[in-house]
Amino acid sequence: MAANTTSPAAPSSPGGMSLSLLPIVLLSVALAVGLPGNSFVVWSILKRMQKRTVTALLVLNLALADLAVLLTAPFFLHFLARGTWSFREMGCRLCHYVCGISMYASVLLITIMSLDRSLAVARPFMSQKVRTKAFARWVLAGIWVVSFLLAIPVLVYRTVKWNNRTLICAPNYPNKEHKVFHLLFEAITGFLLPFLAVVASYSDIGRRLQARRFRRSRRTGRLVVLIILAFAAFWLPYHLVNLVEAGRTVAGWDKNSPAGQRLRLARYVLIALAFLSSSVNPVLYACAGGGLLRSAGVGFVVKLLEGTGSEVSSTRRGGTLVQTPKDTPACPEPGPTDSFMTSSTIPESSK
């Protein structure tokens, strides 16, 4: 996470103690919930899932991205507790670079999930051909490469500097044009464009599902939608504040004015709030698992994701595409293991 974010105010600064308390609480909750939760998801997929579906690979990489950013939380907690940055400039840049990579990887993975579902509904037979693990691995590799590249500005602008007799890890822009560029670049590439693609995908899905009778469409994409909404809820305020800051910078308003100070205070909290987005997904998996959590125990993640790879056959009936899982009755009742991406999709075969 990057752009014009500065580390939360030092506890030794005026009003800093109360300001630092909420970020400390949010970071601690994110670390306590997200670190074991995402580790459990990674362990479940790598150790307990014999045949990993494309969806499982996407979820695995999303959990890895979340783990990466959560591993930086102790450094920020140390800063909040001590009131000064103790990990030199290299630590400053690396911590924020990892946060930037994680943010981009997460939003790109969520976008791919949405596009995958849209393709499966709009072009099910094409989806069957391209939705293979080999192709998915190439896509995932591309996502990580792009994420590393998009986060490079953090390495360029981040530095350690003195502020009120304390060392802070903060951006250092040569001029206001660089600041505006970085703020807008992060908001557009890290949120606006990906979520336009997500909205377009689900608008197309909704339109097509109204015209076609898909099996189990009621459960289609439930968990993916929850993941998208959670990510938007945690990151939209952060990007909105950065856009406001960019506008104020272009207008030449004083950053030390009361409004500018309130904007900085809001950003301190929103940075910590964004960390919670990396801890919420395992909670969503548990909620979406329903009865699986009770029946399958620690294997509920595997059971939840196994449904995303069930084979589906497609036929035309009266001009309408009807998809029926193989080896199941023509009109099966939705079970607890119905996938969150496979309903009305042709899953990966030939893996």
UniProtKB/Swiss-Prot annotation:
GO terms for molecular function: leukotriene B4 receptor activity. Gene3D superfamilies: Rhodopsin 7-helix transmembrane proteins. InterPro entries: Formyl_rcpt-rel (IPR000826), GPCR_Rhodpsn (IPR000276), GPCR_Rhodpsn_7TM (IPR017452), Leukotriene_B4_rcpt (IPR003981), Leukotriene_B4_typ-1_rcpt (IPR003983). Phosphorylated by GRK6 upon leukotriene B4 binding; which promotes desensitization. Residues 45-56, 116-140, 201-222, 290-351 are cytoplasmic. PROSITE patterns: G_PROTEIN_RECEP_F1_1, G_PROTEIN_RECEP_F1_2. Residues 311-326, 339-351 have a biased composition (Polar residues). One of its GO terms (cellular component) is plasma membrane. Highly expressed on activated leukocytes, including eosinophils. It is found in: Cell membrane. Coiled coil: none annotated. Residues 1-21, 78-93, 162-179, 244-268 are extracellular. Glycans are attached at N4, N164. It is a multi-pass membrane protein. Belongs to the G-protein coupled receptor 1 family. Receptor for leukotriene B4, a potent chemoattractant involved in inflammation and immune response. This is Leukotriene B4 receptor 1.
